Amino acid sequence: MQALQSIIDNAFEQRAEITPDNVEPQVRDAINNVIAQLDSGKLRVAEKINGQWVTHQWLKKAVLLSFRISHNQVIDGSESRYFDKVPMKFANYDQARFEKEGFRVVPPAAVRQGAYIARNTVLMPSYVNIGAYVDEGSMVDTWATVGSCAQIGKNVHLSGGVGIGGVLEPLQANPTIIEDNCFIGARSEIVEGVIVEEGSVISMGVYIGQSTKIYDRETGEIHYGRVPAGSVVVSGNLPSKDGRYSLYCAVIVKKVDAKTRGKVGINELLRTID
């Protein structure tokens, strides 16, 4: 693995000069190897090690390099035709392989090669970009988008129209992460490498980036870039220092543990926020 990483790191330093026509075979093979392992889930761009999320920057570099080594080509789909550098993940799947891998894909859901989809996941008409990781038992609902290299945990529900930001455009240092057992409400956006920790509930229409104030109304604490575990979050506003105007923020209205979450439905958690 160290040799593979070295090839990727060195190639990334010369990325501006790499084209599909001049890329060295060793570099092409290394990039394709990484994309295949991301696709199968053997590698992932970020993982939790000793309780902390670690981003493997060299894998992100390989994803970026993959766009340098391929020409656009026609891609056939059931509803249309496409013209892109990245093949679709399911292009060569047959019924036996779908059954073996154990997830559902509802048309016209689109998943790029290099994204991993785990067992018991349901993809409604949605989009999952290259390098993303969607873990077991999760639901990616209609018109939701999982951005490049984003990490989605087990038993996560991404509601209709949710946007989970990627790392490629604009270029971000770390992927957006949604940990296990989270619920992200319809039309919410979580971007710029924000981490939503385990068991959190994000209400409909909440927008969180690195500069968004995440205000805990019980403690008065303000978080940036991280939603603490077990938070129930709604959209809100905080007044300016001079009191002349207010600016958008996300508000943690309560904290719940796994036991409470198991007994109380998501809708009930969001209704009782006064």
Curated annotation (Swiss-Prot):
PANTHER family to which the protein is assigned, alphabetical: 2,3,4,5-TETRAHYDROPYRIDINE-2,6-DICARBOXYLATE N-SUCCINYLTRANSFERASE, MOLYBDENUM COFACTOR GUANYLYLTRANSFERASE
Catalytic activity: (S)-2,3,4,5-tetrahydrodipicolinate + succinyl-CoA + H2O = (S)-2-succinylamino-6-oxoheptanedioate + CoA
Organism: Proteus mirabilis (strain HI4320)
Protein name per its UniProtKB record: 2,3,4,5-tetrahydropyridine-2,6-dicarboxylate N-succinyltransferase
Coiled coil: none
CDD domains: LbH_THP_succinylT
Lineage per the UniProt record: Bacteria, Pseudomonadati, Pseudomonadota, Gammaproteobacteria, Enterobacterales
Entry's EC annotation: 2.3.1.117
Pathway where this protein functions: Amino-acid biosynthesis; L-lysine biosynthesis via DAP pathway; LL-2,6-diaminopimelate from (S)-tetrahydrodipicolinate (succinylase route): step 1/3
Family: Belongs to the transferase hexapeptide repeat family.
One example of a Gene Ontology biological process annotation: diaminopimelate biosynthetic process
Claim: Flavoprotein is one of the keywords in the record: no
Keyword Zinc: no
Keywords tagged on the record: Acyltransferase, Amino-acid biosynthesis, Cytoplasm, Diaminopimelate biosynthesis, Lysine biosynthesis, Repeat, Transferase
NCBIfam families from the UniProt entry: dapD, PRK11830.1
Molecular function in Gene Ontology: 2,3,4,5-tetrahydropyridine-2,6-dicarboxylate N-succinyltransferase activity; nucleotidyltransferase activity
Class of this enzyme: transferase
GO cellular component labels: cytoplasm
Localization terms from the record: Cytoplasm
Family annotation (Gene3D superfamilies): Hexapeptide repeat proteins, Tetrahydrodipicolinate-N-succinyltransferase, N-terminal domain
Stored InterPro entries: DapD_Trfase_Hexpep_rpt_fam (IPR005664), Hexapep (IPR001451), Hexapep_transf_CS (IPR018357), THP_succinylTrfase_dom1 (IPR023180), THP_succinylTrfase_N_sf (IPR037133), Trimer_LpxA-like_sf (IPR011004)
